[in-house]
Amino acid sequence: MGAVSCRQGQHTQQGEHTRVAVPHKQGGNIRGPWARGWKSLWTGLGTIRSDLEELWELRGHHYLHQESLKPAPVLVEKPLPEWPVPQFINLFLPEFPIRPIRGQQQLKILGLVAKGSFGTVLKVLDCTQKAVFAVKVVPKVKVLQRDTVRQCKEEVSIQRQINHPFVHSLGDSWQGKRHLFIMCSYCSTDLYSLWSAVGCFPEASIRLFAAELVLVLCYLHDLGIMHRDVKMENILLDERGHLKLTDFGLSRHVPQGAQAYTICGTLQYMAPEVLSGGPYNHAADWWSLGVLLFSLATGKFPVAAERDHVAMLASVTHSDSEIPASLNQGLSLLLHELLCQNPLHRLRYLHHFQVHPFFRGVAFDPELLQKQPVNFVTETQATQPSSAETMPFDDFDCDLESFLLYPIPA
């Protein structure tokens, strides 16, 4: 889950919603106590109706039967349980199946990894597997408010199809009364946090990360998948220092030759054709890679963030990214070919990278790349403290409130 939020815009000519990302902010993911307004998602007493029920009636949602919901009867003796009507279960099937309650015997929360406007990511211990995972928790009411049911389901559907060593693997997904849960392998840090700490990367590390990302993007594009949000915050680093591409929330199946029109992603990483509202294709991901590599090499973004996509498009179109003369000639050429305004002339195919001067001597093989050490990453990870405190839950869905009031930092 990135730190960037998107807001709904108007429908495009292709019927898609326009989602415009807020400019990149320093500091990565937001941490700290949750706003008290979120408390209403877990507490519904007596005549207080579920947020989900009220939202459903207001929406007149077209996915399922639109029968009106009756108000909950008044019971003075004890409060009514706030259990969503069947529509709120069926709506997220089959990508989010209903499972027996994961509770104290299976999952224990180790800490809070990150929190954004759409949900939170928790570090959990699976007591059965004796392994640590990251669980993305998304309130159903937020999904309905933002009309992102399809987006959430497609995120899980895409991740189930992917099997690649440089992709953050999906462990499980399920739904509770009020939340959707996506469980993945746990990584202790991300590329943005490392970049914020060390600034410019050594050329050897840039070459290794670039090769790993090239393999990932080529793999996804061969499957017809556009990621659409390639950025440092969405690249996790494993215990050996190698990357794992994550967050497929904006990804979409786009067959070769087809085009997309949705304005989505993170402003400073978005290609000119995306900022202008399309049409665009898989070449947009390669522009994002160029922005990322430029930042690793220079310690800054090629173009400063603007307030919206219109201003960002003007900046990208009318300003040439000055590549420092001190950079390796091969790296300078690579950046020029990735940050090409015309997507038709942009570097994009695996064989082009294999013969590129910057990658001379690099074997584009995942197993061989994983054997190469990334010392400064592992050394940085070794200095990070970890929390030994855990919080067991009887009901992983309903008991989240107590943790969110007093989160344990991961």
Swiss-Prot record:
SMART domains assigned: S_TKc
SUPFAM superfamilies recorded: Protein kinase-like (PK-like)
Catalytic activity, as annotated: L-seryl-[protein] + ATP = O-phospho-L-seryl-[protein] + ADP + H(+); L-threonyl-[protein] + ATP = O-phospho-L-threonyl-[protein] + ADP + H(+)
InterPro entries with a match to the protein in the record: Kinase-like_dom_sf, Prot_kinase_dom, Ser/Thr_kinase_AS, STKc_AGC
Ranges for domain Protein kinase: 107-274
Catalytic residues in the record: D229 (proton acceptor)
Keyword Transferase on entry: yes
Top-rank taxon, per record: Eukaryota
GO MF annotations in UniProt: ATP binding; protein kinase activity; protein serine kinase activity; protein serine/threonine kinase activity
Pfam families recorded: Pkinase
Record: residues binding ATP: V113, A114, K115, G116, S117, F118, G119, T120, V121, K136
The entry's keywords: ATP-binding, Kinase, Nucleotide-binding, Serine/threonine-protein kinase, Transferase
Family affiliation: Belongs to the protein kinase superfamily. Ser/Thr protein kinase family.
Stated name of the protein: Ribosomal protein S6 kinase-related protein
Entry EC no(s): 2.7.11.1
